């Protein structure tokens, strides 16, 4: 089958002819329709330090997808041939304390699709049936293919009460932008997003951000004053992994504020802990999606009118995958979709 693989320990992704995966007793075989390129895939393409320490070579990559069930393991129940599915990319062990307590998103033995095991950038993918999520008929393939990063946005944004609150989002990547849309949809008052990428700040405006602030040109404190904010932000969503952005968030949070952190710093990050202590801040780390509450929330949000389609800015056939990766690496894109049909 046709697949995109990290074939060599160097910069790049390669089209290969890979063997069709075998279906286990508890698995589904999915014929891939569309995939989306994730920031993780860009890290793997670039072969940065994280990738060198994490990714076995060769490896079929990719974990954002939608497809159709074409074969079902003999012990699987609840799925039929032809079901349209996406799936949770974190394969969990089922036997650790958190898995047995129903907190599978906190499994300490997680294996990642397209990271630790063969991925979705292929004509066919095998995953455990437990990880598959049926896509409602009124949700398009395009939207279903980005449910994985949308889930990161939903998990982060819905960590705390948002109704009537003022929200600061640091980092206008696709996940941060989708989080801004979620916050506005569920009733936040002001949603301010910061970055230095003008293209993505404009996307954030289209997705409903109250203000999209280029911190290289504008002071966050001035924006707060313009909005009539006198006490700071109630909720912070840190999506950038940039220390300066997190420091700015700590400076502008209200006392008793709550922060959800999804962005991963490049290394050790020192902060002024006295601000956390004296402001009484709550900080929550976010990894992946809650299984499967986040997935149900995603579908329900879209069905209730949330429009995240503007975040999809580029479409390519998989044969033109290089153009898709070039678009993602440029930073001048939202989500990039590859069609496998």
Swiss-Prot record:
Cofactor field: Zn(2+)
Residues the entry annotates as binding Zn(2+) 2: 93, 96, 99, 107
One GO BP: L-threonine catabolic process to glycine
Binding site for NAD(+): 175, 195, 200, 262-264, 286-287
InterPro entries xref list: ADH-like_C (IPR013149), ADH-like_N (IPR013154), ADH_Zn_CS (IPR002328), GroES-like_sf (IPR011032), L-Threonine_3-DHase (IPR004627), NAD(P)-bd_dom_sf (IPR036291), PKS_ER (IPR020843), Zn_alcohol_dh (IPR050129)
Enzyme class: oxidoreductase
GO cellular component: cytoplasm
Active site: 40, 43
Cofactor note: Binds 2 Zn(2+) ions per subunit.
Annotated pathway: Amino-acid degradation; L-threonine degradation via oxydo-reductase pathway; glycine from L-threonine: step 1/2
EC identifiers of the protein: 1.1.1.103
SUPFAM superfamilies documented for this protein: GroES-like, NAD(P)-binding Rossmann-fold domains
Primary location group: cytoplasm
Reactions performed catalytically: L-threonine + NAD(+) = (2S)-2-amino-3-oxobutanoate + NADH + H(+)
Site residues, Important for catalytic activity for the proton relay mechanism but does not participate directly in the coordination of zinc atom: 148
UniProt cross-references to Pfam families, sorted A to Z: ADH_N, ADH_zinc_N
GO molecular function, one term: L-threonine 3-dehydrogenase activity
Binding locations of Zn(2+) 1: 38, 63-64
Oligomer and partners: Homotetramer.
HAMAP family xrefs: Thr_dehydrog
Assigned protein family: Belongs to the zinc-containing alcohol dehydrogenase family.
Role of this protein: Catalyzes the NAD(+)-dependent oxidation of L-threonine to 2-amino-3-ketobutyrate.
Name listed for the protein in its UniProt record: L-threonine 3-dehydrogenase
């Amino acid at each position: 089958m046709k697949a995109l693989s990290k074939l060599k320990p160097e910069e790049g992704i390669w089209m290969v002819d890979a063997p069709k995966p075998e279906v286990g007793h508890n698995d589904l075989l999915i014929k891939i329709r569309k995939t989306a390129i994730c920031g993780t895939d860009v890290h793997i393409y670039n072969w940065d330090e994280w990738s060198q320490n994490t990714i076995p070579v060769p490896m079929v990559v990719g974990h954002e997808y939608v497809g159709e069930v074409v074969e079902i393991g003999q012990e699987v129940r609840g799925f039929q041939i032809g079901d349209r599915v996406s799936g949770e990319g974190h394969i969990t062990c089922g036997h650790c304390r958190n898995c047995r307590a129903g907190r599978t998103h906190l499994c300490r033995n997680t294996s990642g699709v397209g990271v630790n095991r063969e991925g979705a950038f292929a004509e066919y993918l095998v995953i455990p049936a437990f990880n598959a999520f049926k896509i409602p008929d009124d949700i398009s393939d395009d939207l279903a293919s980005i449910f994985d990063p949308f889930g990161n946005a939903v998990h982060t944004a819905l960590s705390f009460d948002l109704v009537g609150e003022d929200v600061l989002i640091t980092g206008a990547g696709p996940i941060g932008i989708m989080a801004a849309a979620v916050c506005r949809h569920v009733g936040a008052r002001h949603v301010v997003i910061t970055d230095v990428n003008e293209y993505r700040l404009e996307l954030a405006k289209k997705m409903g951000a109250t203000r999209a602030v280029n911190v290289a040109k504008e002071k966050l404190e001035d924006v707060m004053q313009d909005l009539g904010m006198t006490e700071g932000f109630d909720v912070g969503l840190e999506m950038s992994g940039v220390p300066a952005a997190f420091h700015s968030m700590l400076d502008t949070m209200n006392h008793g504020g709550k922060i959800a952190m999804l962005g991963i710093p490049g290394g050790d990050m020192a902060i002024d802990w006295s601000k956390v202590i004296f402001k009484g801040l709550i900080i929550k780390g976010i990894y992946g999606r809650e299984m499967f509450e986040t997935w149900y929330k995603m579908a329900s949000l879209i069905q209730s009118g949330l429009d995240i389609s503007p975040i999809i800015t580029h479409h390519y056939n998989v044969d033109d995958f290089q153009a898709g990766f070039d678009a993602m690496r440029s930073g001048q894109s939202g989500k990039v979709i590859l069609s496998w049909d």
